[in-house]
């Protein structure tokens, strides 16, 4: 991949933070109306449009 610029590292770090499941307390609070995160991404299958 080569050298990453600071801006690119920042974007990748944000994408990594966003790539988490919905917290259990959110599921409980919404009575299981919110159970999945539509922005979940797999590093091998999905692209980030970098």
Curated annotation (Swiss-Prot):
Q: Which BP terms in the Gene Ontology apply to this protein?
A: translation
- Keyword DNA-binding assigned to the entry: answer is no
Sorted alphabetically, which keywords does the UniProt record give? Ribonucleoprotein, Ribosomal protein
PROSITE patterns reported in the protein's UniProt record: RIBOSOMAL_L39E (PS00051)
GO cellular component annotations of the record? cytosolic large ribosomal subunit
A Gene Ontology molecular-function term?
A: structural constituent of ribosome
Top-level taxon in the UniProt lineage: Archaea
Region Disordered: start and end of each range?
1-22
- SUPFAM superfamilies of this UniProt entry? Ribosomal protein L39e (SSF48662)
Work out whether the entry's keyword set contains RNA-binding: no
Family to which the UniProt record says this protein belongs: Belongs to the eukaryotic ribosomal protein eL39 family.
Query: Which PANTHER family does its entry note?
Result: LARGE RIBOSOMAL SUBUNIT PROTEIN EL39 (PTHR19970:SF0), RIBOSOMAL PROTEIN L39E (PTHR19970)
Q: What is this protein called?
A: Large ribosomal subunit protein eL39
Source organism per UniProt: Halorubrum lacusprofundi (strain ATCC 49239 / DSM 5036 / JCM 8891 / ACAM 34)
